[in-house]
Amino acid sequence: MNWITNYVRPRINSMLGRREVPENLWIKCPETGEMVFHKDLEDNKWVIPASGFHMKMPAKARLADLFDKGEYEALQQPKVAQDPLKFRDSKKYTDRLKDSRVKTDQEDTIVAGVGKVRGLKLVAVVHEFNFMGGSLGIAAGEAIVKAFERAIAEKCPLVMFPASGGARMQEGILSLMQLPRTTVAVDMLKEAGQPYIVVLTNPTTGGVTASYAMLGDVHLAEPGAEICFAGKRVIEQTIREKLPEGFQTSEYLLEHGMVDMVVKRHDIPDTLATLLKILTKAPANDVSAKSLNGAAAPLVANG
């Protein structure tokens, strides 16, 4: 062995050898196939620049983007029983929870915070879809109820950003019990005279759609979001008929009066601020139509 084999050859091999590239370095647009560098996607609020396709946005990133200067008080995750049913399918439920916590750096699917949007104080609640599909379980239900209680105590509006596959099957009937619990929480906020706005994101389905996601005073939706109770494939297999093109999308639901506005992600903070000033009866000179005019679709009155 000599310096050629000890030094030169390893250097050449390292230069010519295959380098490992992280899987998430480039993101592919599901609509056009365009490849976008992950940093560019994050800087553009997880919206594909060319196609305008709205990718799923991490919950903490959404809160930071929503609140003025990214500043807010994070609400603590309530302590609840872990795996009360001792559920196990192909994998232990506790192991699924551990994997999701490592993946998302969250205790469960709900992240909530108190802060200001264009100077207006509010509580925001966001689902993290990457945590077991944003499913609604005991922990998520308790976090949502606590967020509503905080909004009532602070005498401020609450804005919900659902992104969920529905009730968490690993918690059975205990998961389904969160539907009436969260519904009661919505009623409590309305009785307190505070507005409740829902921003429907992709996807919003199942028991979440059947409860607090469709109980807002105003419903906004991001472009192209899937919003439904049962999925398109399940319905088609049940009725044995082909459903219309674009069925269960934000735009389809807007046309049929199920949502009030379809709003691009970049316009959401301004639109929320304008709507909340109207709903809270702020002085007329404080209310601007600028954000509403910049929305993807006009405000539609239902009924």
From Swiss-Prot:
Catalytic activity: N(6)-carboxybiotinyl-L-lysyl-[protein] + acetyl-CoA = N(6)-biotinyl-L-lysyl-[protein] + malonyl-CoA
Pathway the protein takes part in: Lipid metabolism; malonyl-CoA biosynthesis; malonyl-CoA from acetyl-CoA: step 1/1
UniProt record, GO biological process: fatty acid biosynthetic process; malonyl-CoA biosynthetic process
SUPFAM superfamilies: ClpP/crotonase
Pfam families in UniProt: Carboxyl_trans (PF01039)
Entry annotated with the keyword Cell inner membrane: no
Span of domain CoA carboxyltransferase N-terminal: 25-294
Family: Belongs to the AccD/PCCB family.
Name by which UniProt lists this protein: Acetyl-coenzyme A carboxylase carboxyl transferase subunit beta
UniProt organism field: Rhizobium rhizogenes (strain K84 / ATCC BAA-868) (Agrobacterium radiobacter)
